[in-house]
Amino acid sequence: MPKMKTNKGAAKRFKKTAGGIKYKHATKRHILTKRTTKNKRQLRPNALLPRCEVAAVVRMLPYA
């Protein structure tokens, strides 16, 4: 049986940890002047993926 392919886009965006699958929030790259300080602060920490989306990401990352 051939090796399964890892989805490279998903590999760059998600990291599997003991607590779940970690990812960075979106809309934090550029043009941040219109965003409030509170909003930027809330987007700062990494987030854990919701349970309903874990199965899809795990399929894309077979060796994670």
UniProtKB/Swiss-Prot annotation:
The keyword Transmembrane helix is assigned to this record: no
Stored Pfam families: Ribosomal_L35p
Origin superkingdom: Bacteria
Keyword list, A-Z: Ribonucleoprotein, Ribosomal protein
GO biological process: translation
Gene3D superfamilies per the UniProt record, alphabetical: 4.10.410.60
A GO cellular component entry from the record: cytosolic large ribosomal subunit
GO MF term (any one): structural constituent of ribosome
Similarity-based family: Belongs to the bacterial ribosomal protein bL35 family.
Protein name: Large ribosomal subunit protein bL35
Species in which this protein is naturally found: Vibrio campbellii (strain ATCC BAA-1116)
